[in-house]
Amino acid sequence: MPYLKLKASYGQVGNSSGVDAFYYRGRMWPQNEVYITGVNMGTKLGGYIQDILPNPGLTWEKARILNIGIDTRLFSDRLSVTAEFFKDNRHDMYVVNNKISSLVGNVKEFKQNIGKINSHGVDLSAMWNSNIADWSYFIGGTFSYSTNELIANGEVDQPYEWLKNQGRPLGENRGYIAKGFFNSWEEIAASPVQTFSDVQPGDVRYEDINKDGQIDVNDMVPIGYGDIPRIMYGINLGVGYKGFSITALFQGAAKVSHQYSDIVMNPFTDNGTIFEHQLDYWTPEHQNATFPRLTTLDNANLNNRQISTLNVKDADFLRLKTLEVAYDLPTK
């Protein structure tokens, strides 16, 4: 008879680690150079302002966590499978309410229990072990998928839907849509104004998402995924024969993006050198290049250093982590 085990758990837990000890009382802070109450023997006497408003209703963050799983073994225990589903809904998270108007005063921050994040995912693992005469072999794998959605975080209302963090996964990359490079001064004159620095042929062109005639922070959109993979997986396999064995372990990740640093994208960063892959840069004779024009001036290069689809790339991978060849000595 096959082995079958069902399991489930549900509960609510609290977390007070992010709650500052005395924020429920507010805070007064000295302002010696801004608010002067008088002078004592040539020394300015500063006043105090309330830079953090009191919030006596603060409480700890809460999480409702659901886990459902199954363990089974089939075919005379040669096949074992484990599958689990989880759901983690966090609420009353301790975050700054950026919707509080500055009209209430010179307030540094006002934290409330208004944050909410929902997460869910699955974990799977399977293993097959068997023998054929003097041969033994196994093959197994693991698979994990998780994602989340920011429901509320106290962010201010945004003029465009693509600027909102709410409704999007945490850690998602945001940047500009690169549309290649300017190839002439005529293209620059006919294009939206790029507000980062003066541009010239060979600089990166960005898409004007909101169609207002200029490229600025209002044109930043979600691009790719975050730096933490949504999918992680592994494959392990092996074969044995009369004391000899070969085993291998593969690891992989998917649905992950990475923003490459300046030293990878821009030659001569921090007084460095130029790498071989950076030689594929724009010139009037080589307009179908991978990188923008060559320059050593940081200010001139500011336009080309923006976070964009030019430097945020797919970071999926599959690698062979270990490969082992072994022989077990006989006991006699």
Range-by-range predicted roles:
Residues 1, 8, 68-72, 83, ...:
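Residues on the lipid-exposed face of transmembrane beta-strands in outer-membrane beta-barrel proteins
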Residues 23-29, 98-106, 155-164, 263-272:
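Flexible, surface-exposed loop regions and adjacent strand-edge segments
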Residues 22, 112-115, 129-227:
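Conserved small-residue
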Residues 10-14, 85-91, 128-130, 143-149, ...:
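Transmembrane beta-strands of outer-membrane beta-barrel pores
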Residues 77-81, 122, 133-135, 243-247, ...:
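Repeated loop/turn-to-beta-strand initiation elements of outer-membrane beta-barrel proteins
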Residues 34-80, 109-132, 167-174, 226-232:
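Outer-membrane beta-barrel signature, preferentially recognizing the C-terminal barrel domain
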Residues 2-61, 80, 84-117:
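Solvent-exposed loop/turn elements at secondary-structure boundaries
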Residues 253-332:
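Extracytoplasmic gating/loop element in the C-terminal half of outer-membrane beta-barrel translocons
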